[in-house]
């Protein structure tokens, strides 16, 4: 392999590949409904409305909140242990707990990314007049007041959020920001803790873990709606009304049109369970000789509830379960579906659960790595601590 020219060795010649031209959120996404803020809304809908996805996210949050938090000193010397204790004290001196922050950081799994603004403080003790400097500690070191969540749906597409060549994060712009108007809602990258599920193409918005479940979710939602409609029609039926043709024609008089409108309203109210009875005229339809025509058609005005004859025996439940399995499988959480059928074994259950826990381990390790890189390192620089003594979460 040839040695690169010294004039080029330090240059970043190529580009990451992420579409940053218009500052759009996920500009490279193939599906229009998952691009930009529409995508944020759709993933939020999936997270909040689907029972299977809700169970997956709840299980993930509860498992990861219970993971012990350990600050590892660089060695066993008193100095190194002292610096590790400082980091522990920082995490314990925020307005919220670290568990609460992790719970919020896990929103990056749903949306692909999560931003938190770091609010720093001088640790001046619990009795200091300026509340912004309140702390359990009075050592004067820099600490952290809070890691303030910046909700995904408040992030505005912005051409100045990323470096157009490298794709590196420069900052984020919030809608209706309460920041200083001079900043115009822009929060620079050095004030942020930035979580994302993947760094492919250096896309700052990552990739939602629900992306591969989107198709199954769409079909599942449609089938559940169809199932509910089918059950309703089977139980309640569809009201059918009959009245003389002259009431329905274009040449109907105003009185006939008024009667027709009242009749249509009656049918609609019966369908919506807003009306408990229907009062109809008892007049019969007569032939040319003035005699009743007989049968159901003998009534001049009539209402009938039509129900299914049960001839279409399509069991929709297995189809719904298949899509629920697909959603769980897409995030290795298929163990949640165990017991929904007669098949399966303990060995299979343990294998699926172990796979899920392994994936959870990678998520929590990623969160701790980002905290070490984007929170502890800046604190180290602010306090002027020796870099070689910096511990890791």
Ranges and model annotations:
Residues 1-65:
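N-terminal-proximal low-complexity accessory segments that begin disordered
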Residues 1-18, 22, 265-298, 381-393:
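C-terminal anchoring/interaction modules
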Residues 41-214:
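Structured, mid-chain assembly/scaffold modules that mediate subunit interfaces
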Residues 78-86, 90, 94-97, 101, ...:
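Short amphipathic alpha-helical segments
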Residues 102-105, 117-120, 232-234, 238, ...:
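Short coil/turn segments at secondary-structure boundaries
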Residues 155, 172, 294-306, 343-348:
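Conserved catalytic-core motifs characterized by acidic clusters
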Residues 195-326, 330-334, 338-339:
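Extended, charged amphipathic alpha-helical segments
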Residues 314-393:
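C-terminal helix-loop subdomains that flank or include functional centers
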């Amino acid at each position: 392999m040839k040695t690169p020219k010294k004039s080029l060795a330090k240059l970043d010649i190529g580009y990451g590949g992420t579409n940053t031209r218009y500052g759009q959120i996920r500009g490279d996404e193939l599906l229009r409904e998952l691009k930009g803020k529409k995508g944020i809304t759709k993933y939020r809908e999936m997270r909040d409305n689907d029972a299977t996805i809700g169970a997956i996210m709840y299980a993930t949050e509860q498992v990861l909140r219970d993971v012990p938090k350990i600050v590892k000193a660089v060695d066993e010397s008193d100095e190194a242990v002292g610096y590790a204790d400082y980091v522990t004290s920082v995490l314990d001196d925020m307005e919220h707990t670290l568990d609460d922050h992790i719970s919020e950081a896990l929103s990056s799994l749903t949306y692909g990314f999560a931003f938190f603004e770091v609010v720093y403080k001088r640790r001046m003790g619990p009795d200091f007049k300026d509340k912004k400097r309140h702390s359990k500690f009075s050592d004067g070191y820099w600490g952290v007041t809070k890691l303030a969540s910046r909700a995904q749906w408040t992030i505005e597409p912005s051409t100045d959020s990323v470096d157009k060549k490298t794709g590196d994060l420069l900052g984020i712009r919030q809608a209706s920001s309460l920041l200083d108007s001079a900043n115009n809602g822009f929060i620079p990258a050095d004030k942020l803790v930035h979580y994302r599920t993947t760094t492919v193409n250096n896309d700052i918005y990552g990739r939602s873990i629900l992306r591969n479940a989107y198709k199954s979710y769409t079909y599942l939602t449609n089938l559940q709606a169809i199932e509910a409609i089918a059950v309703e029609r089977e139980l309640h039926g569809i009201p059918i009304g009959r009245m003389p043709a002259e009431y329905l024609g274009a040449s109907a008089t105003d009185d006939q049109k008024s009667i027709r409108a009242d009749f249509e309203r009656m049918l609609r109210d019966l369908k919506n369970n807003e009306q408990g009875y229907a009062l109809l005229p008892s007049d019969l339809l007569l032939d040319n000789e003035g005699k009743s025509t007989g049968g159901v058609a003998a009534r001049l005005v009539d209402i009938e509830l039509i129900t299914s004859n049960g001839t279409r025996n399509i069991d929709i439940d297995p189809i719904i379960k298949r899509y629920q399995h697909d959603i769980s499988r897409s995030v290795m959480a298929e163990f949640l579906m165990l017991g929904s059928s007669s098949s399966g074994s303990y060995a299979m259950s343990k294998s699926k659960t172990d796979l899920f826990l392994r994936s959870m381990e990678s998520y929590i390790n990623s969160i701790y790595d980002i905290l070490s890189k984007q929170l502890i390192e800046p604190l180290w620089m602010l306090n002027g601590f020796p870099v070689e003594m910096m511990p890791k979460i």
